[in-house]
Amino acid sequence: MPSHLARWTGLAGATLLALSAFLGGAFPAGPLRSTPVSIWQGTNGPLILAAWLVGTGLMAYAWWALRDGGPSTRWALITVGLWMLPLLIAPPFGSRDVYAYTCQGASFAGGISPYEQGVSALPCPWLETVSPIWRDTPAPYGPLFVLIAGAVVKATGSLTASIVLFRALSLVGVVLSAWALPVLARRAGVPAKRAVWLALGSPLIAAHLIGGPHNDVLMLAALVGGLAVVASHPGRPGMLLVGGLLLGVAVAIKSTAVVVVPFAALAATAGPYRIRTLIRDGGWVVGGAVAAVVGVTVAGGLDFGWVGGLSQGGAAVAWTSPPTAVGQTIGYIAALFGGHVDALPVTRGIAVVLLAVLLVWLWWRARTRDPLYYAGLALAVTVALSPVVHPWYWTWPLFVLAATARRTGWFVVVALVASFLVLPNGIGLPRFTKTVGAPLMTLLVIVVVIWLVRSARAARQPVATD
């Protein structure tokens, strides 16, 4: 597809997404328990669904068509900016999380720790806008985001103004990412135009990080910013400390970013890997990250009770999480024989152990390879083995791999598929496709495992020589 055609195709798709948001987005007074059928049967239902699916499809096609990069970085940035214009003025869509952000901010502003009680404890003046699952659940976010949410509510005092400010903050995250991604890409030997296009042009960014809006883009901006600073100044203590502080900011927004810190420490070393240089150079990165997290926690008066609150995100059950899908499938098979098996605690527990092993293994391999690329892989396995996987979680590895992977590959396909899993009012299609989705995901897990085992065996085979 010619680049100019891709630009206008994506803009048409973004305009259709905005139309579907105005007709059936995640409005404050919207229904909290709708289904695809109830949307179809409601006012403008067919138009809402058609605009959403066609719009997502157009954006996805344009993004995929130029997955190896457009004409230039400047062209990519201008195109992404054009695509975001209609979305910035649309009501929230693709998720209702912004209402939970606002109520958690109201709780904190009211003197209640959102890590100890749900938003119903205040109660939040906009409680009816929050999905029931989050009303009595502690916040699963880091202390910095709680501080930000509290400041937003204090500054605005209204729900609408808070949503506008949250979306503005998401836009700031996109702008900061637009600076950091080319820097990180150049250090990794990846075309900057491709990195910007893959990371910021993805439909996941439009439909979730901006449309939601979601706080993930703030975490990602600090994350890629920290990696860019570290990769650009190996062996320089002052700049490594700055990079570590940025990574700590990312962790203080969403704790998932912590898996990147050990890889950033490797990237900080000047010259070949040695334990001495790792301690000398990587220590500045780790120290900066720890200082940022501790500083924000103490400044917010939250102590470290927020660490326990981070485990609250696993209440949802959806087949988009591979370990959850395997557990669901085991239960379905048992039901065929008249049994009842709740395998979720087992499969999720195994996934946690496997994740720990894989992270250590990836770090060990990264010592003599590209730690920046392996940081992206670490985020990918973290998402894949999490007990709950929302579609926008795949933006985490997407941002890093877009700037560090030498070839576009599976991560682009995953992001493409994930773009179609949520409807404009925020309901997730996996909720209504469990009996089909879970077995299919389980089958995919089996196929991937077999492929990985065969690839590992092939890599060990000696190369024949004449």
Name these PLM-found stretches.
Residues 316-347:
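Membrane-lumen/periplasm interface segments of multi-pass, membrane-embedded glycan/lipid transferases
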Residues 1-312, 348-466:
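Multi-pass membrane glycosyltransferase architecture that uses lipid-linked
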